[in-house]
């Protein structure tokens, strides 16, 4: 699920299908009905901005406690044999409200994180900064996934090695641009 999404275009079926929410539903074999969209992404905003800014443009805001409660309920409803992924929005320091960031949301949920990063120029700094920020809140990092960007200045393996050298024992997996995830990909 992706509880918060900005850049949402409710009136365009193609845009819905191409959105993160549409892609998540399609990957589960779920039709993008109003009910399915509400269940996956209840906090939707039109402007492609940080959620706090996008919500403000619509005269709205995100109720942080409601967001956390929604996610906790979904975790509770997930069976023992199921896996629930809660996709964030932007980076860990993206503002959700006037006082809360994605980092606060992650910390409040207390769930381990699968940090997905690109392989673009600057990703090493962004990744190390995100991990350091998570450490300040004692957030468990399950693994880092490097999703190969369209333009990677160096091979993803070099990026992974550099990140690993600075973080120590981090689990890092690489997903190549062609989408062929490693057969042994386990988190």
Mark where each language-model region is.
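Short internal beta-strands
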Residues: 2, 114-117, 142-148
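N-terminal phosphate/diphosphate-binding loop that engages ATP/GTP or pyrophosphate donors
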Residues: 1-61, 73
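Phosphate-binding/switch loop-helix module in NTP-utilizing enzymes
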Residues: 50-96, 103
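A general structural detector for well-ordered alpha-helical segments in enzyme core domains, enriched
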Residues: 20, 70, 102-105, 130, ...
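Anionic group-transfer/hydrolysis microenvironments
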Residues: 4, 89-90, 120, 149, ...
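Inter-motif core of Ras-like GTPase G domains
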Residues: 97-120
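C-terminal lobe/tail of nucleotide-utilizing enzymes
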Residues: 131-187
């Amino acid at each position: 699920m992706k509880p918060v999404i900005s850049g949402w275009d409710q009136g365009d079926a193609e845009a819905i299908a191409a959105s993160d929410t549409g892609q998540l539903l399609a990957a589960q074999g779920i039709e993008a009905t109003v009910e399915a969209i509400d269940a996956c992404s209840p906090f939707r905003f039109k402007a492609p901005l940080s959620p706090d800014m996008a919500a403000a443009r619509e005269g709205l805001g995100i109720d942080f406690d409601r967001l956390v409660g929604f996610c906790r309920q979904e975790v509770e409803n997930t069976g023992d044999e199921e896996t629930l992924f809660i996709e964030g929005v932007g980076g860990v320091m993206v503002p959700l409200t006037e006082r809360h960031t994605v980092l606060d949301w992650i910390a409040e949920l207390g769930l381990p994180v699968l940090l997905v990063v690109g392989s673009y120029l600057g990703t090493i700094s962004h990744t190390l900064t995100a991990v350091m920020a998570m450490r300040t809140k004692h957030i468990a990092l399950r693994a880092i996934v490097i999703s190969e960007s369209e333009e990677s200045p160096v091979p993803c393996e070099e990026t992974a090695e550099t990140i690993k050298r600075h973080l120590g024992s981090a689990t890092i997996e690489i997903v190549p641009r062609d989408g062929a995830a490693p057969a042994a990909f386990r988190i």
